[in-house]
Amino acid sequence: MPRARRRLFLRRFSPGSLASMTPRELVFLLVLLFLGFLAPHWERRTGDFLEGVVTKVVDGDTLVVKVEGELRRVRLIGVDTPETVHPRKPVQYYGREASAFTKQALSGRRVWLEYDVAPLDKYQRHLAYVWVERPARDEDAVRRGMFNAMLLLEGYGRTMTIQPNSRYADLFARLQTEARKAGRGLWGRKR
């Protein structure tokens, strides 16, 4: 930038000169500030993958993941495992097995979080698909590398679609049917 233009820019946008800005310049500055505040939250809306480490497994479908120095309580999208820690419900059939499977598979492990449309639930938990391999969106990659799908395939949970987070709902329904037909997990035992 030429020296004369640089001085003009610095003079126009120095802290003491806000009052002398034109309305157009003020709007431009406000838009820049607004975009700067939104930037950390874009990752939740774009479907990008965030890398983190599982620091705690709460139960079969809820984890705590450390992402960029921040601990996030994460609820897996599209799958519901039987309860083990609900304050008003007893431990449900196959709940201990689902929790043990999740702990064994994810405790201390590097994972990738994939957000869908709504990033948080009413309890302020992050809603995500959790990948244990580098993510890809083809069906084979989902079966092999997405933990939500693994829970369904192994019969540790049932599908649960809460709109608008339904990116993999059709595939998850097929995976549950496959587990049920094969008698895996909670589909294989008599109560």
Question: Model-derived features: where do they sit?
Answer:
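Small beta-barrel nucleic-acid-binding modules, primarily SNase/OB-fold domains
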Residues: M1-R191
